[in-house]
Amino acid sequence: MDMFSAPDRIPEQIRIFFKTMKQVVPAKAVCGSTVLDVAHKNGVDLEGACEGNLACSTCHVILEEPLYRKLGEPSDKEYDLIDQAFGATGTSRLGCQLRVDKSFENAVFTVPRATKNMAVDGFKPKPH
């Protein structure tokens, strides 16, 4: 890059919050990343057993009503997985399916107190 080229664009960051049973965790979120990735990068215990491949419900989060309405309907596959999630509500979504944008600024994502991981051996994968 020469001195007259445009500088590389810095990804826009916003702030979101994760509400767990013990605390509310502020998190820096890069627009375009998934809520699951943001949770992992900020030390929030949101499982993501399938590593974001829409094959489980362990990254289930509960959204506030205004944000849920703004996002539009989940896919049929996501709906099916939400039906299997522990403590699912009318505003539940999967963190791996939510791409952060500016409309998420200051949003609160509630992390349920448990997940249903269908693994029978007790294995809990580490965040990637």
From Swiss-Prot:
Cofactor notes: Binds 1 [2Fe-2S] cluster.
Residues reported in the UniProt entry to bind [2Fe-2S] cluster: 50, 56, 59, 96
2Fe-2S ferredoxin-type domain: residues covered: 12-115
SUPFAM superfamilies: 2Fe-2S ferredoxin-like
GO molecular function, one term: 2 iron, 2 sulfur cluster binding
Location of this chain's protein in the cell: Mitosome
Predominant cellular place of this UniProt entry's protein: other
Cofactors (names): [2Fe-2S] cluster
Record Pfam families: Fer2
Gene3D superfamilies linked to this entry: 3.10.20.30
GO CC terms, sorted: mitochondrion; mitosome
Job of this protein: Ferredoxins are iron-sulfur proteins that transfer electrons in a wide variety of metabolic reactions.
Entry's family note: Belongs to the adrenodoxin/putidaredoxin family.
Name of the protein: Adrenodoxin homolog
Organism: Encephalitozoon cuniculi (strain GB-M1)
